[in-house]
Amino acid sequence: MLKGLKKALKERFCSQVYISFNVDHNLLSTQVIRIKNDRIKEKFFKTFETKVETKSGEVPIQALKIARSYSQKYPYTYFSAMSKAKEVLCEKQAFEELKKENYPACAINQKYCVYVESEDFLKDFKRFKVQDVDFLFSPFSLIYDFVRDSLEEKPLLYLLLERSRFYFLIADKKEIFLAKSVFLEEQPEEFIESKEEDSVEMNDEIMKAFLSEIQEDIDSLEEAMGLDRSKDNKEKNEDAYSLIEGMTNIPLIANALQEGLRSVYHSRDIDFVEKVILLDSCQIHQKALMHLQETLMMEVSRLDFSLVERLNILARMENEKHAF
């Protein structure tokens, strides 16, 4: 009873602030939500270039100032981020039997979890010099929480796409068959070592053939980029870069997904996966999306996905679980 009273007083008279961070490519995204008496009093989203001045990590000083101003003004401020370390999918029971005390684990559902080596886990924390990261979530927890109410009896492939990396999960209502992350860009040395099994490369012949195939699209867009610098042409410029970047990554993404599917078909008795659900956090170009669908020869359904928004949703859920 006392616990419930404390919780009610806290929610009624104290603001709770949730601040989430995510670094992708050369941008840091953050969402700030302030809640009081079960009502959202303040909510905003900001992006910062990580190439600008930073302090002992990847968070720009401007973002640090926002974070610290809220934490100083509101005692109940919680920070969340997404793990970028290599994670291993495991059944919870098997993980407990392994007795890996120095391997932090993150639950995906009631049956499965992912764990990371303590060294990689600490590197994740060092990336965000805010105060403490209260909640560090697995990308696979974010994926599963987003799709769990729409899981089907047959297995589907769920793909979370960022500019610098992507994550995919093969699952149905009962099982998770595979969870894997793949880097599209070289990672900072202080963050994670690049490992051969986690990288994807294209040989010169495949790259030349692919670029030749999309050259007409690139030429027409580059022509638009060379016009006078009006507002419309700035949008065309951004559209061109989005297409070129997206189209160049499609063979890499498709190859990794096909490898993952082959490994699951070889090791598990499951039906063929016929559909990909793309959780798009980087606004993939429509032509790149169509190219992915054609390359995989599978239906690809795209959903808008805000990483920082989902991080704050999970942080609020976790905070509710452990509230006094």
Predicted stretch roles:
Residues 1-324:
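Hydrophobic/aromatic-enriched cytosolic interaction surfaces used to assemble or bind macromolecules
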